Amino acid sequence: MIQDNSATKGSDATHQMSQSEYALVQNLTVLYGEGGASYLAKRMMAIAMGELMARPEEHADPKPLSAADRMLICYGDSVRDEPGMPLSALRQFATQYLQNSISTIHILPFFPSSSDDGFAVIDYQTVRRDLGDWSDINALSADFDLMFDLVINHCSRENLWFADFVGGREPGCDYFHEMPSMVGLESVVRPRNSPLLTHVHTYQGIKRVWTTFSDDQIDLNFANPEVLCEFVHILFSYIAQGARFIRLDAIAFLWKELSTSSINLEQTHCVVRVLRALIDEMQTRTLLLTETNLPHNENVSYFGSRDEAHLVYQFSLAPLILYSYLFNDGQYLGQWAEQLEPPPAGCSFVNFIASHDGIGLRPLEGLVPASDIQRLTDAAHERGGFAAMRSADDGTETVYELNIALFSAFGGTAKNIPAYLGAHQLMLAFQGIPALYLNAFVGGLNDLQGVESTGRTRSINRGHWQLDDLKTILATETNEQSIIFAELNRSLEIRGSQSAFAPSAQQEILAYTKDSLWLKRENTDQVILVIASFSEAPIETELPRQDAEYESVIDLLSEDAVVLTKAVPMAPYQVRWLSIAKT
């Protein structure tokens, strides 16, 4: 405990603060000054406690991360079953097919929204009526852990806060960034090529507001502590509804400062530390995940000193794996993986190859030459995909993500299945928690009709499935989608019971060449040697360091006995998980 000697007016009482409360006050002091920091801290703790007391049973039972943690990413209406509600259909699908392979479902924003498939939130506290209601969310949480998005950087222009801004009313009149001009904004880092400032007609005339992502997504002003208090309320209402994981969407852009890049500012890290300190103080089981699709060093900075995010995405992994399999060359992946620092104790990575967004290319900066990044872009175009652009610092436009369904990126035919499965099985072996996007899990292809109907290139990978159609597809053993789903499901089941795949288990790159990579995962109970082939032809590869205890082992995936004292045969694109029990 830490003694707080700052007495309230008229009192000489001292207050014994916990470590987390002390961190809360210190970070609020950085953000808003010393005068009101203690008051703000107490107010935020009261807000959090008030939400948690409403449903005390939903935020108990903390549990450590393990190999059994495996995530599914999907929309609330990814699976449909008219006339029933999509969230009910999702539960039917998940309970029938995923009980042994998936532990957590990340339901992408399921709140009323005006654009961007949920990421322009109108009402943070309500479930979209066309999806279901909170009882459907609670029903899912009975069978799976859940992840919710906290869309914290911006809200919809249809949000009541922005209606207040337009009307000059409290509280929202001071919740947004009103900018007189572009002066001082020349260095702002842009994730898009849309205008940074949007002109809005208000009762007081035309105003310019900050819009990082689109003119429908208005950035919130966290220099106003009332805005942060609003999001403390929202965060803990989600925790009270049973969220085990909270994803902080677009968090890197949160704090704005004139004449700076307005990305990854220290104040943004302070806000994350405030949320983390509150979670620690309330002793909830909830873990924070930051979404920062940036170069690796910037991304992992959100671990802080074990006082910010519990989890960060390993964004570089997805495009590096894609490059390795498309061009039969794993050297960039090996170079990057070899120099990876392990996450701090108590923290972990989240790994994926595909998500609802495109395949980000900014995480390749400094890892892959521009000419080879262009090769990836060209390959996506050749396979029916799109390249999304952002405005660079010099005013030019540059590709920031590839919009394409993952199986289409691999070629989208039966002959591409071995590479597609191998890529996933390698991703599953990397240190961290694996996350599979539903459309990739079932081998979905480019949804060009979706692009045409919405006018947005990201819709190419955001298709929906009718539950009965999906069941029919998965029951037909000879089609590509059924083969992919069955093998990925089996791989996830196997992974879940291997202690060496726990997020805390050590990782070491033993060797890599253009054709192959050797990866070692180890904890006190088990060693798993992972071999991945990037070759379209059969190859043989040898264990880099001979060890007597590794002479004969079992491949968990193929169930073959493998002798490691001689070259190991590998089929095209094969991945092996060689298990060695410790005695």
Region locations from a protein language model:
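Active-site and adjacent substrate-binding regions of carbohydrate-active enzymes
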Residues: 2-545, 558-583
